[in-house]
C-alpha cells in the first residue's frame, strides 16, 4: 500500500515538475521571440510602438536630429548670406516657404500701337469693364488682366501728376503773395520816409574871422566850467537857441573836439536879439544861482531891518 502510494506520489510530483518546467520553457520561448522581433524591427518602428518614451516624437524630429549631427540643413530650410550695416557677412537660416528664389514676374511690354489705343480709351473713359474690356483686349491681342492692370497704373499716374501740379501752384501762389507783401512794405517805407533837411548855411560856411561855432575850442576857467566864444553882434548878456536844436537834428561833434558849453548865444529865427537882464547872464560858477538867491535874501532882510 505504502509502496503504491509513494509511487503514485512520486508520479504526481514528477508530473508537476514536468508541468512547471514546461511553463518555464514556454515563458522563455516567448521572451526570446519578443527579443528577436525587437531586434529585427527598425529604430523608427520601435520608437513609434513604445509610447511614453522620449523617442515617441514624429519621424521628422529624428531626421532633423540626424541632419544636425551630419551638419546638413533639413529640406524645408535654406541658408543665405546677408551683409549687415557694419559690413560683416552673416549666414542666416530661413525656411524655404518664403520662396526668396522665386523668379520675378516679367513685365508686359506694349507696342506703340497698343499704347496709342489704350491711351485713347483712357481719355474717353478711365474705367473699362465688361464687354468693352474684353473687346479691347481681343483687338490688341492682350489678356483682360493686362488691360485691367494698365488702366489701374494709368489712373495712379494721373493722380500723382495732379497732386504735383496742385503743389506747384500752391507754392508759386505763396511765393507771389510773399513778393507782393515785400514790395508793398517797401513802398510804404519809401512813402513814409522823411526827406533829409537842407544843410545849414551857417554851419556849412562859418565866418572866416571867428571860425566855426562848433569847432571853436572851449576855454576852461578856474572853477572848471567851460564857456564858448560868442559870435559877433551878440552881447555878453544875451542867451539864444540854435537852429539845430529847433530842427530836431543835433549836430555831430567833430572827433577830438569837446562838446560846446551850455551857455551860448545864437540869433533866433526872427533875427532879433532878445536881451535878458544881466542878473540872468551866464556865470563862471555853477553855484552862482544859489549865491544870487542868498544875496537877494540878504538884501530883503536888510530892507526889513531898515524899515
UniProtKB/Swiss-Prot annotation:
Signal peptide extent: none
Matches recorded under InterPro entries: EMX-VAX-Noto_Homeobox_TFs, HD, Homeobox_CS, Homeodomain-like_sf, HTH_motif
DNA-binding annotation, residue ranges on this chain: 103-162
Entries under Gene3D superfamilies matching the protein: Homeodomain-like
An individual GO BP term: neuron differentiation
Chain intervals with Basic and acidic residues compositional bias: 25-38, 159-170
Disordered: region residues: 1-70, 155-175, 197-254
GO CC terms, sorted: nucleus
Major subcellular site: nucleus
Subcellular location: Nucleus
Protein family membership: Belongs to the EMX homeobox family.
Primary role: Transcription factor that may function in dorsoventral specification of the forebrain. Required for closure of the choroid fissure and together with vax1 is required for optic nerve differentiation and to limit retinal development to the optic cup.
Name of the featured protein: Ventral anterior homeobox 2
Source organism of this protein record: Danio rerio (Zebrafish)
The gene coding this protein: vax2
Amino acid at each position: 500500500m505504502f509502496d503504491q502510494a509513494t509511487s503514485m506520489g512520486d508520479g504526481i510530483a514528477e508530473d508537476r515538475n514536468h508541468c512547471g518546467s514546461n511553463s518555464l520553457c514556454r515563458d522563455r520561448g516567448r521572451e526570446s521571440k519578443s527579443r528577436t522581433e525587437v531586434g529585427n524591427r527598425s529604430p523608427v518602428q520601435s520608437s513609434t510602438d513604445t509610447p511614453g518614451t522620449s523617442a515617441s516624437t514624429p519621424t521628422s524630429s529624428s531626421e532633423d536630429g540626424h541632419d544636425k549631427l551630419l551638419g546638413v540643413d533639413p529640406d524645408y530650410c535654406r541658408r543665405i548670406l546677408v551683409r549687415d550695416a557694419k559690413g560683416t557677412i552673416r549666414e542666416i537660416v530661413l525656411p524655404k516657404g518664403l520662396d526668396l528664389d522665386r523668379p520675378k514676374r516679367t513685365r508686359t511690354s506694349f507696342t506703340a500701337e497698343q499704347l496709342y489705343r489704350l491711351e485713347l480709351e483712357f481719355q474717353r473713359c478711365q474705367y473699362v469693364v465688361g464687354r468693352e474690356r474684353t473687346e479691347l483686349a481681343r483687338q490688341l491681342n492682350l489678356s483682360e488682366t493686362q488691360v485691367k492692370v494698365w488702366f489701374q497704373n494709368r489712373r495712379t499716374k494721373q493722380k500723382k501728376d495732379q497732386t504735383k501740379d496742385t503743389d506747384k501752384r500752391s507754392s508759386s501762389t505763396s511765393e507771389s503773395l510773399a513778393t507782393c507783401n515785400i514790395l508793398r512794405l517797401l513802398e510804404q517805407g519809401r512813402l513814409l520816409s522823411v526827406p533829409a533837411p537842407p544843410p545849414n548855411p551857417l554851419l556849412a560856411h562859418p565866418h572866416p574871422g571867428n571860425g566855426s561855432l562848433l569847432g571853436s575850442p572851449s576855454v576852461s576857467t578856474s572853477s572848471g566850467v567851460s564857456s564858448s566864444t560868442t559870435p559877433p553882434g551878440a552881447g555878453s548878456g544875451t542867451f539864444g537857441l540854435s537852429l539845430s536844436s529847433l530842427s530836431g537834428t543835433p549836430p555831430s561833434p567833430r572827433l577830438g573836439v569837446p562838446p560846446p558849453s551850455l551857455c551860448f548865444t545864437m540869433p533866433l529865427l526872427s533875427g532879433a536879439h532878445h536881451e535878458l537882464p544881466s542878473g540872468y547872464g551866464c556865470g563862471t560858477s555853477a553855484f552862482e544861482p544859489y549865491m544870487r538867491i542868498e544875496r537877494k535874501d540878504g538884501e530883503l532882510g536888510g530892507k526889513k531891518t531898515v524899515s
